[in-house]
Design a protein with these regions (language model features):
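Conserved beta-strand-loop surface patch within small alpha/beta domains used
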Residues: 1-65, 72-114
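Residue-level recognition of short, structured coil/turn motifs
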Residues: 20, 145-146
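Residues at alpha-helix termini
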Residues: 88, 144-145
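Eukaryote-biased recognition of intrinsically disordered, low-complexity regulatory segments
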Residues: 113-121
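Second-shell loop/turn segments in exported
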Residues: 121-127
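Active-site nucleophilic cysteine motif
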Residues: 128-144
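...with weaker cross-activation on analogous glycine-rich loops/strands in unrelated enzymes
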Residues: 156-173
Length: 173
Protein backbone atom coordinates (compact mmCIF):
# COMPACT_ATOMS: atom_id res chain seq x y z
CA UNK A 1 0.00 0.00 0.00
CA UNK A 2 1.31 3.41 -0.98
CA UNK A 3 0.18 6.61 0.70
CA UNK A 4 -0.46 9.02 -2.16
CA UNK A 5 -0.29 12.79 -1.75
CA UNK A 6 -4.05 12.90 -2.24
CA UNK A 7 -4.65 10.35 0.54
CA UNK A 8 -2.27 12.22 2.86
CA UNK A 9 -4.15 15.48 2.17
CA UNK A 10 -7.48 13.82 3.04
CA UNK A 11 -6.06 12.37 6.27
CA UNK A 12 -4.47 15.71 7.22
CA UNK A 13 -7.76 17.56 6.58
CA UNK A 14 -9.69 15.07 8.71
CA UNK A 15 -7.14 15.32 11.54
CA UNK A 16 -7.44 19.14 11.47
CA UNK A 17 -11.25 18.96 11.65
CA UNK A 18 -11.15 16.58 14.63
CA UNK A 19 -8.35 18.39 16.49
CA UNK A 20 -7.89 18.43 19.52
CA UNK A 21 -9.59 15.00 19.51
CA UNK A 22 -8.02 12.04 17.74
CA UNK A 23 -9.29 11.40 14.24
CA UNK A 24 -9.63 7.87 12.96
CA UNK A 25 -10.41 6.18 9.69
CA UNK A 26 -9.66 3.33 7.34
CA UNK A 27 -7.75 2.95 4.11
CA UNK A 28 -9.51 0.54 1.77
CA UNK A 29 -8.32 -0.05 -1.78
CA UNK A 30 -6.08 3.02 -1.49
CA UNK A 31 -8.95 5.33 -0.50
CA UNK A 32 -9.27 7.05 2.88
CA UNK A 33 -12.60 6.69 4.69
CA UNK A 34 -13.02 8.87 7.80
CA UNK A 35 -14.74 7.17 10.75
CA UNK A 36 -16.32 8.48 13.93
CA UNK A 37 -14.16 8.21 17.04
CA UNK A 38 -16.43 6.42 19.53
CA UNK A 39 -13.85 6.25 22.34
CA UNK A 40 -15.10 7.46 25.74
CA UNK A 41 -12.33 10.09 25.75
CA UNK A 42 -11.55 10.93 22.10
CA UNK A 43 -8.95 13.53 23.09
CA UNK A 44 -6.76 10.73 24.46
CA UNK A 45 -7.70 7.58 22.52
CA UNK A 46 -9.50 6.41 19.44
CA UNK A 47 -11.95 3.63 18.80
CA UNK A 48 -13.70 2.73 15.57
CA UNK A 49 -17.06 1.04 15.93
CA UNK A 50 -16.55 -2.62 15.04
CA UNK A 51 -19.82 -2.84 13.09
CA UNK A 52 -18.77 0.23 11.11
CA UNK A 53 -15.52 -1.52 10.20
CA UNK A 54 -17.37 -4.65 9.08
CA UNK A 55 -19.82 -2.59 7.03
CA UNK A 56 -17.02 -0.61 5.37
CA UNK A 57 -15.24 -3.82 4.49
CA UNK A 58 -18.40 -5.35 3.00
CA UNK A 59 -19.07 -2.34 0.75
CA UNK A 60 -15.57 -1.17 -0.14
CA UNK A 61 -13.19 -4.14 0.19
CA UNK A 62 -10.38 -5.30 2.43
CA UNK A 63 -9.02 -2.87 5.01
CA UNK A 64 -5.42 -1.99 4.18
CA UNK A 65 -4.69 0.31 7.12
CA UNK A 66 -6.15 1.81 10.27
CA UNK A 67 -5.56 5.55 10.58
CA UNK A 68 -5.56 7.76 13.66
CA UNK A 69 -3.98 10.96 14.87
CA UNK A 70 -1.90 11.98 17.87
CA UNK A 71 -3.01 15.54 18.65
CA UNK A 72 -0.02 17.55 19.88
CA UNK A 73 2.11 14.45 19.45
CA UNK A 74 4.25 12.71 16.90
CA UNK A 75 3.53 10.07 14.28
CA UNK A 76 5.21 7.26 16.22
CA UNK A 77 3.08 4.48 17.75
CA UNK A 78 2.38 4.58 21.47
CA UNK A 79 2.76 1.43 23.54
CA UNK A 80 -0.98 0.75 23.24
CA UNK A 81 -0.75 1.34 19.46
CA UNK A 82 2.02 -1.27 19.22
CA UNK A 83 -0.09 -3.84 21.06
CA UNK A 84 -3.12 -3.14 18.86
CA UNK A 85 -1.08 -3.20 15.64
CA UNK A 86 0.08 -6.72 16.43
CA UNK A 87 -3.47 -7.85 17.18
CA UNK A 88 -4.96 -6.45 13.95
CA UNK A 89 -2.02 -7.52 11.77
CA UNK A 90 -2.53 -4.69 9.25
CA UNK A 91 -0.68 -1.44 8.63
CA UNK A 92 -1.38 1.60 10.76
CA UNK A 93 -1.07 5.19 9.62
CA UNK A 94 -0.43 7.68 12.41
CA UNK A 95 -0.72 11.44 12.09
CA UNK A 96 1.24 13.71 14.42
CA UNK A 97 -0.57 17.05 14.38
CA UNK A 98 -0.24 20.12 16.56
CA UNK A 99 1.46 23.44 17.12
CA UNK A 100 5.10 24.25 17.78
CA UNK A 101 6.08 26.62 20.64
CA UNK A 102 6.22 29.42 18.04
CA UNK A 103 2.61 28.73 17.01
CA UNK A 104 3.36 27.08 13.67
CA UNK A 105 1.27 24.05 12.76
CA UNK A 106 2.99 20.75 12.09
CA UNK A 107 1.71 17.56 10.50
CA UNK A 108 3.66 14.34 10.10
CA UNK A 109 2.06 11.22 8.58
CA UNK A 110 3.77 7.83 8.81
CA UNK A 111 2.80 4.31 7.88
CA UNK A 112 3.78 1.54 10.30
CA UNK A 113 3.93 -2.19 9.64
CA UNK A 114 2.44 -4.45 12.32
CA UNK A 115 4.84 -6.27 14.60
CA UNK A 116 4.37 -8.59 17.52
CA UNK A 117 4.82 -6.49 20.63
CA UNK A 118 4.61 -7.44 24.28
CA UNK A 119 4.28 -4.64 26.79
CA UNK A 120 6.47 -4.84 29.85
CA UNK A 121 4.66 -6.08 32.94
CA UNK A 122 5.90 -3.09 34.94
CA UNK A 123 5.54 0.50 33.78
CA UNK A 124 3.08 -0.18 30.98
CA UNK A 125 0.76 2.49 29.63
CA UNK A 126 -2.80 2.00 30.92
CA UNK A 127 -5.81 1.87 28.61
CA UNK A 128 -8.95 0.06 29.68
CA UNK A 129 -9.79 -3.01 27.63
CA UNK A 130 -6.38 -3.11 25.95
CA UNK A 131 -3.75 -2.65 28.65
CA UNK A 132 -5.64 -2.76 31.89
CA UNK A 133 -5.44 -4.80 35.09
CA UNK A 134 -6.94 -7.87 33.44
CA UNK A 135 -4.54 -7.74 30.48
CA UNK A 136 -1.66 -7.49 32.96
CA UNK A 137 -2.84 -10.73 34.61
CA UNK A 138 -3.32 -12.33 31.16
CA UNK A 139 0.19 -11.38 30.08
CA UNK A 140 1.78 -12.61 33.31
CA UNK A 141 -0.01 -15.97 33.16
CA UNK A 142 0.84 -16.38 29.48
CA UNK A 143 4.54 -15.43 29.71
CA UNK A 144 5.50 -16.90 33.05
CA UNK A 145 3.12 -19.84 33.50
CA UNK A 146 2.15 -20.72 29.91
CA UNK A 147 -1.52 -20.45 30.89
CA UNK A 148 -3.63 -18.57 28.36
CA UNK A 149 -6.61 -16.78 29.87
CA UNK A 150 -9.52 -15.84 27.60
CA UNK A 151 -9.88 -12.29 26.34
CA UNK A 152 -13.27 -10.59 26.26
CA UNK A 153 -14.67 -7.15 25.55
CA UNK A 154 -15.04 -4.95 28.63
CA UNK A 155 -16.29 -1.40 28.65
CA UNK A 156 -14.75 1.14 30.98
CA UNK A 157 -16.71 1.60 34.21
CA UNK A 158 -18.66 -1.67 33.88
CA UNK A 159 -18.07 -2.42 37.57
CA UNK A 160 -19.95 0.74 38.58
CA UNK A 161 -23.17 -0.27 36.81
CA UNK A 162 -25.50 -1.95 39.28
CA UNK A 163 -27.08 -4.40 36.84
CA UNK A 164 -24.05 -5.14 34.66
CA UNK A 165 -23.31 -8.81 34.10
CA UNK A 166 -20.41 -10.14 36.20
CA UNK A 167 -17.71 -10.19 33.52
CA UNK A 168 -15.12 -12.29 35.28
CA UNK A 169 -17.59 -14.86 36.57
CA UNK A 170 -19.26 -15.20 33.17
CA UNK A 171 -16.00 -15.49 31.24
CA UNK A 172 -14.18 -17.97 33.47
CA UNK A 173 -16.93 -20.53 34.04
Amino acid sequence: MTLTKHTKRLIHAHAKICYPAECCGLIIDGQYYPCDNVAPNPAEHFEIDYLNMVEMQEYHGEIQAIVHSHPNGNAEPSEVDKVQMGLHDIDWVIVGLGHTPTGATYCDIKRHKPTTYQSPLLGREYYHGVQDCYSLVQDYYSRDLDIHLPDFHRTDGWWEKEHHLPLYENNFT
